[in-house]
Amino acid sequence: MSQAAAQQPSRKKTVISLLVLLALTCIIVFIFKDHWAEITMALAQLSVWQVLAVLAVGLSYPLLEGCVAWVIVRSRLPQFTLRQGLDVGWCGTFGNVVTLGAGAVPVQLYYLHKAGLSLGPGAGLMTLEYVFHKTTVLLYATVMLLLQHRWLSANTTGVMRYLPMAYAVVAVIIVALVLLCVSPLVQNLARWLLGFLPKTEKWQQRRADWLEQLEVLGTESRRLLADKPRCLKIFALQALKLFGLFCLPYLCIRFMGLSPLGFWQVQLLTSLMLFVSNALPNVAGMGSIETAFLLVFGSFLEQGEVMSVLMLYRIASYYVVFAASAVGFFIAQRHLVQMEPPKEG
C-alpha cells in the first residue's frame, strides 16, 4: 500500500469540487422552480425549534460514523480515542464531497497513518466499515420489507412496482461484497479471476496492488470478525445511525403537516430510498438520493409536497453536514499536529 493512497485533498481540487457542488445545487433549484412557492410556504411554517431538531438529527449521522470508526480502529490501536474517531468521521464526510466521491478513504487513511496505523490495515478497516454499513442497509431494508410488504404492495403503482427488482440487484452486490471480505472461497475465486487480466506491465501492476489489498482485507476481516462483541457494537451503531437518518423525512413531513404517513411507513420508504440510490450514479453524494427520493415518496405525496420534504431533508442531511465536516476536518488537522502516534496492538 503506497503512501500516495493516503492523502489530503488539495486546495485546487477543493475549489473545483465546491464549484461543481454549487452547479449541481443550481440545477436542483432550477428543476424545483415551478414549485418554489409551495416549497417556501412549507418551509416558512417551521419554527426555529423544529428546524434545530431536524438539523440535530441530520448531524447525528456523521457523529455516529465517527463512533463506528472509533470502535473499529480500536481493534488495531487500543489507545485510539473517541475524539480521534470523530475526526476520522469528519474527514470521511469532507473528503467524500471535496473529491467528488473519490477521496473519502484516502483522506481517512492520511489521518489514521498520522495517528500511527499502517496504511494496509487502515485501508482494510475502512473497507470493512463500508461493508458493515452496506450490510446494515440491506438488513434494515429487509426487515422493514418483511414487516410491511402487504402495505407497500397495496399502495404502490407504476414505477414503484420495480422496487423488488432494484432491491434484488443491490442485495446481490452487497452480499458479494460481504463474501469477498469473509469467505476464503470467494477470495480465492477473486485471485483466480485476476489472473486473466492482460499481461501488460500496467495491468500486472494493478493486479499486484489488488492482490495485496485482497490479502490485507482478508487478514483484517478475520481479525475483526473474531471479536464478536465488537462486531455487535458496530452493527448497533450502524443501525442507530440509519434509524436517525430515516427519521428525518418523517420529522419533515410532520412539521410541515403534509401527509398521514405513519412513522414506520416512512422508515420503510426511506430505507428503500437509500437502497435504490445505491444503484444510481452520483457526484459527491448528489443526484442519486434526489432521484430515489422523488421516485419512492412521489407515490405518497403531491409533487410540491415531496419537493418541499426533499429540500429540507437534503439541507439537514447533506449541506449542513458538509459545512460541519469542513469545520471538523480543519480541527482534525490541528489534532494531528498535537498527537503522538501510538503503537499498533
Q: What is the predicted role of each segment?
A:
Residues 64-94, 252-269:
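Membrane-embedded helical hairpins/re-entrant loop segments and their flanking transmembrane helices
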Residues 221-272, 280:
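Transmembrane helical segments that form the transport core of multi-pass membrane transport proteins
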Residues 13-16, 45-53, 222-236:
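Membrane-interface helix starts
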Residues 10-11, 47-49, 78-87, 118-119, ...:
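Membrane-helix interface segments
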Residues 29, 40, 69, 73-77, ...:
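Membrane-water interface at transmembrane helix exits
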Residues 51-55, 82, 86, 123, ...:
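Hydrophobic alpha-helical transmembrane segments
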Residues 37-45, 213-226:
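A short amphipathic helical element positioned immediately N-terminal to and/or at the very start
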Residues 1-41, 92-204, 282, 286-345:
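Transmembrane helix-loop-helix hairpins in multi-pass inner-membrane proteins
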